[in-house]
Structure formats: structure tokens, C-alpha cells
Amino acid sequence: MDSQSPSAGARPITHTTTPPARKLPDIHLDIVLVVFCGGAIGTAIRYAFAQIPAAGSFHTGTFVANMLACFCYAGLTAYLAGASRFGARSKELASRGLGMGVCGGLSTMSTLALEGFTAIRDGQVAAGIAYLLVTFALGLVCASAGVWAGTHLAGSSNVSAEASADTNAATTSKGGKA
């Protein structure tokens, strides 16, 4: 056998490539500030809801806070996606400040998990599981309702903005002032 043949123990040539370096995300201080301020507001509202007394294993304050956050965040997202009268920067600030900040500070997955786990640990297994399931199911319902509301609000604001533009254009074309 030829000593140069691959079967004679010669190693095949391999090409190694180094993966491209990961680029760190750009941190914008104005976005950090609106998230921080929104989070403070959402957390304060969450604290107010926490003062609502629980009904057995059903923690009303946590439930209301989470449902409101689901509805508002989904509604805000749908509204901003459909509203054409705002620029990209305004939409980003609103999404980060109101959505991530206020709604993020308002909602509380960790407290929900703790309350459900505590009920189960304390022997209220059915009540704890029911609380968790009802919260998740109604959270989806609230988010769906929020998407519907946000979509319709965006559609009606776009229609009114277009009607206003049409009225201004008609007035201008007739020699009036816009």
C-alpha cells in the first residue's frame, strides 16, 4: 500500500473556522430610564393590589394584578403594532416603558408560583392547582381580549387620522385653510 494513501494512516486536512464574535447589545439609557420608571409605577400598583385579602387559597390581589397586566400588555402591543400615527421611536419608548416597565412590574409570576406551591404544600392540592390553572387560562383570555381591544383602538385611531387628513386635504383643495 502507498504510504500517501488515506488508508495508510494519513490524517485528513481539516479546516477550522472561528465563530464570529458576539456583539453585545446596545444599551440605551433613555430606554433603561423609561423601563425603570414604568417598573416603579407597576410595582407600586402591584403593592396596592397585594393589600386585597386572599379568599382562602385564591389570592385575589395577585390574580387581579396578573389579569390586568395580561390585558394591558397584549392590548398595548396590538395597538402599537396597528397604529400608524406614531413613529418607531415613540412606539419603542411606549412599549418599553408601559409594557415592559408598568405591566412587567405589575405582573408577578414568582408570587403566583409561590402561592400555588404554598397551597399545595399545605395540603390544599386541589385549590392550589385550580388557582394556577384558572390564572393561566384566564390570563390567556385577558390577553386575547387585550389584543382585540388594542387592534380595534388602533384601527379606529387610524380611521380618524385618515378622515382628518382627508378633511384637511378637501378644505385645502377648495381654497380654505388647512
From Swiss-Prot:
One of its GO terms (molecular function) is metal ion binding. The chain crosses the membrane at residues 25-45, 63-83, 97-117, 129-149. The keyword Lipoprotein does not apply. Pfam families: CRCB. Na(+) binds at residues 104, 107. Na(+) is not transported, but it plays an essential structural role and its presence is essential for fluoride channel function. Keywords: Cell membrane, Ion channel, Ion transport, Membrane, Metal-binding, Sodium, Transmembrane, Transmembrane helix, Transport. GO terms for cellular component: plasma membrane. It is found in: Cell membrane. It catalyses: fluoride(in) = fluoride(out). GO terms for biological process: cellular detoxification of fluoride. The keyword Transmembrane helix applies. Coiled coil: none annotated. It is a multi-pass membrane protein. Belongs to the fluoride channel Fluc/FEX (TC 1.A.43) family. Fluoride-specific ion channel. Important for reducing fluoride concentration in the cell, thus reducing its toxicity. This is Fluoride-specific ion channel FluC 2. The lineage of its organism: Bacteria, Bacillati, Actinomycetota, Actinomycetes, Bifidobacteriales.
